[in-house]
Amino acid sequence: MAPGLVVGLNKGKVLTKRQLPERPSRRKGQLSKRTSFVRSIVREVAGFAPYERRVMELIRNSQDKRARKLAKKRLGTLKRAKGKIEELTSVIQSSRLAH
């Protein structure tokens, strides 16, 4: 933000910043509709992995810390484990609402 001064730390000509189109790399990690649809179909057909079923059972029995520890052991990092716990908790809640 140059104020048009000739000297000083903020010196320089006043310009309007160019609006550049967003780079494709900025989309990295963002889920597309197609990908989310395919994942939902796979989840429907294949079901849950054995460790996921065990984690869900632990969550149902309100052993959240144990469930987190198991998920971390299986997935490698606590961040991934927290995401998985969140996903499985939402699955449990939606199944409760369905019945």
UniProtKB/Swiss-Prot annotation:
Name the domain of life. Eukaryota
Main localization, broad class: cytoplasm
Cellular localisation: Cytoplasm
- Key words of the record: Cytoplasm, Ribonucleoprotein, Ribosomal protein
Q: Name one GO cellular component term.
A: preribosome
Which GO terms fall under molecular function for this chain's record?
structural constituent of ribosome
Q: Which InterPro entries match?
A: Ribosomal_eL36 (IPR000509), Ribosomal_eL36_sf (IPR038097)
**Does the entry feature the keyword Ribonucleoprotein, yes or no?**
yes
Q: What is one Gene Ontology biological process annotated in the Swiss-Prot or TrEMBL record?
A: cytoplasmic translation
PANTHER family for the chain: 60S RIBOSOMAL PROTEIN L36
Name the family. Answer: Belongs to the eukaryotic ribosomal protein eL36 family.
Q: How does it assemble?
A: Component of the large ribosomal subunit (LSU). Mature yeast ribosomes consist of a small (40S) and a large (60S) subunit. The 40S small subunit contains 1 molecule of ribosomal RNA (18S rRNA) and at least 33 different proteins. The large 60S subunit contains 3 rRNA molecules (25S, 5.8S and 5S rRNA) and at least 46 different proteins.
The protein's role, per its UniProt record: Component of the ribosome, a large ribonucleoprotein complex responsible for the synthesis of proteins in the cell. The small ribosomal subunit (SSU) binds messenger RNAs (mRNAs) and translates the encoded message by selecting cognate aminoacyl-transfer RNA (tRNA) molecules. The large subunit (LSU) contains the ribosomal catalytic site termed the peptidyl transferase center (PTC), which catalyzes the formation of peptide bonds, thereby polymerizing the amino acids delivered by tRNAs into a polypeptide chain.
Name by which UniProt lists this protein: Large ribosomal subunit protein eL36A
Q: Which organism is it from?
A: Schizosaccharomyces pombe (strain 972 / ATCC 24843) (Fission yeast)
Phylogenetic classification of the source organism:
Eukaryota, Fungi, Dikarya, Ascomycota, Taphrinomycotina
